[in-house]
């Protein structure tokens, strides 16, 4: 994922946010060689896809939401599989695959049983964060054409992000956004398939929630910069992981000042009015929010820190968006 750098006075926040993306993994059973990263929910909320890091590799597993039992999606033995996304009919999963050092990440699509893998991406670009349109005819994804950094204290990374759409076989690629971005989040497509929501940040613009038309590509048709209570930074709020839900509102994560550092809680914003609704309270450090297509369930990672404040493990949580109840999902079968 990208947010997916020239440093401004907020350079510390930018570095923190990049670390936020790099460190988003979960350890299980005390075995640091097994870590869980990004999550995705099937359309009916019955399955979760996660990427599981093993040493220098990572592979995608499907997890039953009722039992927590995990099974491998593919038979890959090298590289890194990340950022899974279910098709709206639940029959396919798209994900990002990085072959290894010296290569760029590309998008792969497989049947939900792991068969019939199909990959497409140019070797000179970095593709990331695929999502399906509700009519199951289009994939929207982000692409970075540059790799490097503008500061000696930052690790090299992909930037100059743009968003594209294509047919399911990777053909008919067309650009959606009229500009490139320093950082971007994963996209989420509206229920009617006519627009997408992302969090963007430019070289000269602060972080914002932006809604783009998928019918008439160009500048954003609407931008929002919600201010949550006790927000971490009023000028440049820390927010990410926007998700459209069926009623047209957007569910996202934002950072506020908590008792023991930042709380990355989940909020809902009404697009037409900007009205905010808080859905969780005191998450601590949390990442990778994803909402099911029916808008009933969200999945995310909640982190635990050690005595020195380092991230050491996290837990997959499920949030009922109606009752606002959260519960942990204990995953087995990752070895």
Regions found by a protein language model. Give the residues of each.
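A cross-taxon signal for low-complexity, glycine/charged-rich
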Residues: 2-6, 14-15
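Bacterial N-terminal signal peptides
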Residues: 15-24
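Sequence signature of WD/YWTD-type beta-propeller architectures
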Residues: 27-335
